[in-house]
């Protein structure tokens, strides 16, 4: 009801735990289109739901937009899935991509897709730079986590293998050699939490790692701003089939004025200007991770300049309002 009153949006739930383009979902989508006289369709994830695009087109959809993330890369690479993804691209009007890496990987996957370059258009989530903005340390959080006088390295993300939090923990002993007051603040929840706990224990740094858990969107800037450095050494998995789509949290950290240490996986390279807003590292190299973070801690003025440059870059290129207007123009012509 709140979404309807505020945005004019009707939310329709389905009993399926995972929404897939099954005959039942196709049929239900067609009925919803007819009920609300829908002509413009947006698929939040191109694969696999946009396989419904052809059916919806026949039923009256005049403009269909689908957004690609990191996982569409393996849809475009794996032989059988590639055929399905080619069908998706053929059936839609626009395929949104987060950054240049994702665009190029998908375009170069096949001639059939490359011949439809005109359908590709960048659509990024955008950053609310009023929400994600530099701010003084939250005294309550400083007291809660006993951070007074500590050199805080912050990482925000789901606790999953791709995000590379284990590599940060493995790099921590080398960082502590130079900065014994350093501490790693991990924000997020996920299936690798116990593994990360064990890794920290084995490395002898458990007392130097804080597992803050999941925090609300409203509180996230306060957590990010506790850090001097934001680091998340994301990595590619399964022979490059699982990659980081963009890493929006790097941009959120930049908007908060922090230098970012970014892993070289997939579209994460589009979320940093190497040596300007942060440092791009080989996420498989623990020594390189440790060196990048230590260098930023050792040169706080240079780190601050990177953070300031990052905020300026986000304001100029990743503002929520500008991306919202671009998306609305593509979808409904506003």
Task: List each language-model region with its residue ranges.
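Short hydrophobic beta-strand element within catalytic cores of glycosyltransferases
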Residues: 230-231, 250, 255, 259-262, ...
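Conserved acidic donor-binding segment of nucleotide-sugar-dependent glycosyltransferases
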Residues: 273-275, 279-286, 295-301
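A short, well-ordered alpha-helix in the C-terminal region of glycosyltransferases
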Residues: 181, 288, 295, 302-316, ...
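Nucleotide-activated donor-binding/catalytic signature segment of Leloir-type glycosyltransferases, i.e.
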Residues: 115, 196-221, 229
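Acidic donor-binding loop of glycosyltransferase active sites
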Residues: 225-243, 258
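Short His-centered aromatic/hydrophobic patch
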Residues: 43-49
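Conserved donor-binding/catalytic core segment of Leloir-type glycosyltransferases
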Residues: 147-163, 169-172
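Donor nucleotide-sugar binding/catalytic pocket of nucleotide-sugar-dependent glycosyltransferases
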Residues: 82, 90-136, 211-212
């Amino acid at each position: 009801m709140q979404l309807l009153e505020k945005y004019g949006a009707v939310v329709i739930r389905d009993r399926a735990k995972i929404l897939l383009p099954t005959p039942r979902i196709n049929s239900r989508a067609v009925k919803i289109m007819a009920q609300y006289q829908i002509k413009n369709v947006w698929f939040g994830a191109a694969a696999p739901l946009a396989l419904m695009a052809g059916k919806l087109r026949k039923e009256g959809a005049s403009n269909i937009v689908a957004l690609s993330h990191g996982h569409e890369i393996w849809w475009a690479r794996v032989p059988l899935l590639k055929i399905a993804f080619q069908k998706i691209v053929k059936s839609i009007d626009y395929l949104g991509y987060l950054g240049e890496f994702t665009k190029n990987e998908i375009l170069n996957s096949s001639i059939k897709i490359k011949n439809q370059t005109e359908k590709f258009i960048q659509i990024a989530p955008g950053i609310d730079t009023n929400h994600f903005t530099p701010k003084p340390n939250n005294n309550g959080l400083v007291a809660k986590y006993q951070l007074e006088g500590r050199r805080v390295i912050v990482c925000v993300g789901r606790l999953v293998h791709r995000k590379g939090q284990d590599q940060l923990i493995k790099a921590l002993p080398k960082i502590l050699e130079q900065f014994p007051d350093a501490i790693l603040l991990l924000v997020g929840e996920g299936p690798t939490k116990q593994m990360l706990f064990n890794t920290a224990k084995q490395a002898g740094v458990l007392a130097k790692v804080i597992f803050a858990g999941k925090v609300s969107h409203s509180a996230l800037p306060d957590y990010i701003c506790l850090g001097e450095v934001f680091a998340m050494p994301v990595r590619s998995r399964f022979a490059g089939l699982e990659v980081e789509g963009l890493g929006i949290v790097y941009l959120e950290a930049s908007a908060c004025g922090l230098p970012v240490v970014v892993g070289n996986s997939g579209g994460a390279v589009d979320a940093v200007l190497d040596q300007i807003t942060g440092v791009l590292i080989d996420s498989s190299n623990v020594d390189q991770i440790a060196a990048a973070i230590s260098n930023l801690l050792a040169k706080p003025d240079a780190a601050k300049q990177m953070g300031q440059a990052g905020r300026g870059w986000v304001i100029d290129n990743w503002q929520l309002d500008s991306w919202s207007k671009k998306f609305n123009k593509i979808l409904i012509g506003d």
